[in-house]
Amino acid sequence: MEAVLNELVSVEDLLKFERKFKSEKAAGSVSKSTQFEYAWCLVRSKYNDDIRKGLALLEELLPKGSKEEQRDYVFYLAVGNYRLKEYEKALKYVRGLLQTEPQNNQAKELERLIDKAMKKDGLVGMAIVGGMALGVAGLAGLIGLAVSKSKS
């Protein structure tokens, strides 16, 4: 599962599916499979803007898909949001998937990895906030010391 989360699309694949998508769009109608393939490539990009574009395409597909297609769309919506570190959204999608498919092992593993990332980032976030608080307290102490020395 971690390979799926960390896999990067090749430039060749991205360009190939982008051309196909734009060609169909110019002709007036993009097939669901073409839109999904392009979105899937974008979600695996190293650029956050591409990932967001891929997520928008997947969200657009969601109401149009069959139950099986929707499962794939929701899964990649979770993956894309994970890659953007939008863990709350990723969790929402993966838990929605688990409500309809409680035995889906891929979704269970993805949920576990999202929870793990949230805990890791939460601890890192708390350490940063704690460090900032210590810095502010230290600075206030130094200012207080300087003020008291200047008065004496």
UniProtKB/Swiss-Prot annotation:
Signal peptide annotation: none
Domain comment in the entry: The C-terminus is required for mitochondrial or peroxisomal localization, while the N-terminus is necessary for mitochondrial or peroxisomal fission, localization and regulation of the interaction with DNM1L.
Record text on subunit structure and interactions: Interacts with DNM1L/DLP1 through the TPR region; may form part of a larger protein complex at the endoplasmic reticulum-mitochondrial interface during mitochondrial fission. Interacts with MARCHF5. Interacts with MIEF1. Interacts with PEX11A, PEX11B and PEX11G.
The protein's role, per its UniProt record: Involved in the fragmentation of the mitochondrial network and its perinuclear clustering. Plays a minor role in the recruitment and association of the fission mediator dynamin-related protein 1 (DNM1L) to the mitochondrial surface and mitochondrial fission. May not be essential for the assembly of functional fission complexes and the subsequent membrane scission event. Also mediates peroxisomal fission. May act when the products of fission are directed toward mitochondrial homeostasis, mitophagy, or apoptosis.
One GO term describing the cellular component: peroxisome
Localization per Swiss-Prot or TrEMBL: Mitochondrion outer membrane; Peroxisome membrane
Keyword Lyase applies: no
Protein name as it appears in the record: Mitochondrial fission 1 protein
Cytoplasmic side: 1-122
Keyword Phosphoprotein: yes
Cited SUPFAM superfamilies: TPR-like
Repeat (TPR) residue spans along the chain: 71-104
Post-translational modification N-acetylmethionine, affected residues: M1
Chain's gene name: FIS1
Keyword annotations from UniProtKB, A to Z: Acetylation, Apoptosis, Membrane, Mitochondrion, Mitochondrion outer membrane, Peroxisome, Phosphoprotein, TPR repeat, Transmembrane, Transmembrane helix, Ubl conjugation
Phosphoserine: residues bearing it: S10
